[in-house]
Structures are given as structure tokens and as C-alpha cells.
């Protein structure tokens, strides 16, 4: 007797499973890796991506992957690990994608030959544990160095980060600016939110300035603003989250009165309410008033007559930074406004920078902060420069916290690769092959840097393997030197340094991503569920909502 067909999934559902599915996922990841591969290293190329948000020029792995509309579910894993690397460390986003792709490429041969994915996963996790141990053993501590040596180390780490960016030609100028900005912060917290980057179109890149305090662009102002003072020493600062303007009547508003004098009393009461608010602010002793909400022309003129500076519609992020830097507390009412909630700074002034005017709060006593005002020509250039500086700031912060560095340019990857190969000889079974594959995958970093710089990567890798095989304290620091004729150099002596946390995070994230993709053996997709849904509350034929909509349209005369 024939067994009836049992349908478990909706009609049209696509299911893929088994070895073919794993291979398909690996191929999808490989195609994404090929896109970002050419952006790695000091000679990496940029990508021009045009989408709904306009044209974007970038060579930052996380930015590129975020702008690409990737639909393959397995390939989206790369976007996640690049974003995690960017959020956690700030740099190494392309490296982590390349490493994950290479680990999957190496595992593809094992899967095709019949090795179980869990054996590959186990081998990769064991290799990762060894790699992190070797990473610690081959790092250099700077905790016992002098302040001058530490600062030099921070400058070199910032320059290494900027080497592969659009600002590579100005790395000395911007690395000094970045280190100064991070040094301004409280050394115990190193809160990145207290460093702001403001972009001003026009002028040269070298016209960029560092403000040791908070700076933001002058907001929209009403008549009377010109009469307000633009410079204060040790001012009292009041932060508000209330409107200080007369509200217009709402459309179709209705007031029922028996006597025309009643209307005058209503208007007078409204004026009295706003004047009462303004009086309380003045009585508190505030000399600078900032609000997230509008400050109207009446309030602007009132403050100008009393030598008080005011600015409304200030961005929430800028208010937050001013609050942290000056010690002010944002108020949602002016009732009970006292000296306790007012902040202060050493100097406040409004300055012209390029075509814009900026409000500068300097010498802030409570929480030290800094603002980089970035200049440049094209908007796309400034936007990419801002992303580059963000990466460098994150790197310097991490360096100050970790106090350990490793040589860059693929040097540490080659040394760990050599040590893993030696260790694999002592390992039994199939795991030995997987550890060897992990060691080979690490070589993708120096290989790609050499390729992107125009060197013969095969020759460069052979020379580097020979150097690292000498097992000396100097030879282990050899990596790709794009300026050398033979393509190799001692990257520790060449000051190509990276914080250990960048490599540690990259190895861990790439391995986790590879293991996650290898553990997926089935994908279930329902094309119908991916179709755009009708907006909620739409017209439904014969339904109550549909009738209500028709009735409303009839009232409006549609």
C-alpha cells in the first residue's frame, strides 16, 4: 500500500540541505570576501558605492559591507562580524572578513572529501586557543615604558591604522591630533563619546583643528541674537529640554468667550507664563542657555537685553557632551532652578571656522573632552576621513587600555602560523590537518597586503617563511614592507605596530563566524514570506476598517 505524501511546509518553500548546502554557503561568503579583499593594507583600493544615501567612497570593510544590500543569509554573517569588530576595536574589519573567508575556503576541501563539519569546527576551535596563546607570548608590553615612549607607541599605532586609509598622506598630522584628543580624556574612563568629530566643507585637510573641549555648529537663531555676547570666561551654563517661545494656535482651534476682554486675559496669561520662565532662568545666574527645543525670538531678545547667550534646537548628542564636560544637568522645567544644576567651563566663545560659526566650550573641569573639526573639499572625502579618524581613535584608546602591541603587516600572523604547524606535528588524527589548515589560512593577511601593493605575493611569502624559520627574536618580527624592494622588512623596527586586542578580536570573530557557517546544514526559505506585506490598517473590502475609511473620506469630501 502506498504511503500518503505528508506536507510539513507551505507550498513554494525551498529547502536545501546536506553537504551541498554547506558548500553553497562557503561559496556565498567567498564572493563577498572577494569584494573587500582589495581594500586591505596601505596600498588597498577604495570602493565607490552608490545607493539611496548617495555615493560613498570607502575602504573600510565594515562600511562597505553595511552599504551592500546582501540577501544571502549565510553571507550576512560577515556583515555581523565586521560590525562587531568595528564596534569593539575600530580597526581590522577587512582582516576579520578575509580570515573568515580563508578558513571556510580551507574547510571546503575537507567537507568535499567527506570529513564531518564538527571535526573541522573542533580543530578550528583548538587552533584558535593555541593562536591566542602564541599571540600573548609574542606581544610586547609597554606598561613599564616611560611616558614619552608610551606616547611614541600611541602615535605609531595611530599611523598604522591611518596607513590604509584615505588620510595616509597626512598620517603624521592626524595621528598627533588623535593622540592629543585621547590624552585629553579622563584616563580611567577613556569615553569615546566625549570626542566629537565635526565636518566642515572647504579648505585643506591640514586646516583641520583640535578643540580641547566641546564644539558644535551654531544653531538657527532669531532676531536679537547679534546683540548677545559671544565670549565668556567661567560662565554658568544652563541646559534645558523645554520650549521658550510663544506657541501658535492649533489649526481650527476654538475659544468660547462671553466678553472680548476675556480673550485679552487669555493672551496676557500666555505672555505672563513665558516671561515667568525667562525671569527664573535669569534669576538662576545662568549666562549661557542651551536647549534641545526651540528658543523663540521673544526669548532671544529678552536674553540679549540681559547679556545672556542662548541657542535652541541643539543636537541631543552635543547637549550630552556639554552636560558631561561642564557638569550641567538637563532640566525639563525652570521651577526650582538653582546653582546646583548649572555647569561651567573655563572659556566659551563663538568662532568662525570656514563658512560656518561654531560654539566652543574649552577648559571643561568636570569631564575632559575634545572635538576634531575636520576640513576638506568633497563631502565624500570628508565623510571617509571621519570614518578613518574614528578607527584611529578607537585604536589609540584600546592601546592605552591593553598596554600590549604586536608587529603588523602580517608579521604576527606568519609567526603564529609557523608555531601552529610545529604544534600540529604533535597532534593525532584528523584534527592535525585542520590545525594545519588554520595555520595556512593566517597567511592570507600578508599575502593579500603584498598583492594589493603590487608585489609578487608568492616570492614575498617564501622569503618571510625563511625569515621566521630562523626562530630568532628579530626574525619573528618580519612582515610585508610595501616600500622595500624585496617586499619584506622588520615591522617592529619600522614602527608598524598594532594593539594586541585588534588581532585577538579578529582571530576570535573570524573563527566563530567560520564555525557558525560550517554548522549550518539546512536552509529553509519561503519566497512568499519574503514578499512585501500590505501596510497595517489598510482598506479591506467589506471590513469594518474599510467602511470607516470610506466614511472618513465622505466627510472630507473626497
UniProtKB/Swiss-Prot annotation:
Keyword set includes rRNA processing: no
Gene Ontology cellular component list: chaperonin-containing T-complex
Region described as Disordered: spans on this chain: 524-558
Recorded family membership: Belongs to the TCP-1 chaperonin family.
Native source organism of the sequence: Tetrahymena pyriformis
A Pfam family per the record: Cpn60_TCP1
Record flagged with keyword Lyase: no
InterPro entries: Chap_CCT_eta (IPR012720), Chaperone_TCP-1 (IPR017998), Chaperonin_TCP-1_CS (IPR002194), Cpn60/GroEL/TCP-1 (IPR002423), GroEL-like_apical_dom_sf (IPR027409), GROEL-like_equatorial_sf (IPR027413), TCP-1-like_intermed_sf (IPR027410), TCP-1_chaperonin (IPR053374)
Subunit structure, as described in the record: Heterooligomeric complex of about 850 to 900 kDa that forms two stacked rings, 12 to 16 nm in diameter.
Lineage: Eukaryota, Sar, Alveolata, Ciliophora, Intramacronucleata
Highest taxon above the source species: Eukaryota
Function: Molecular chaperone; assists the folding of proteins upon ATP hydrolysis. Known to play a role, in vitro, in the folding of actin and tubulin.
The protein, known as: T-complex protein 1 subunit eta
Gene Ontology MF annotations: ATP binding; ATP hydrolysis activity; ATP-dependent protein folding chaperone; unfolded protein binding
PROSITE patterns: TCP1_1, TCP1_2, TCP1_3
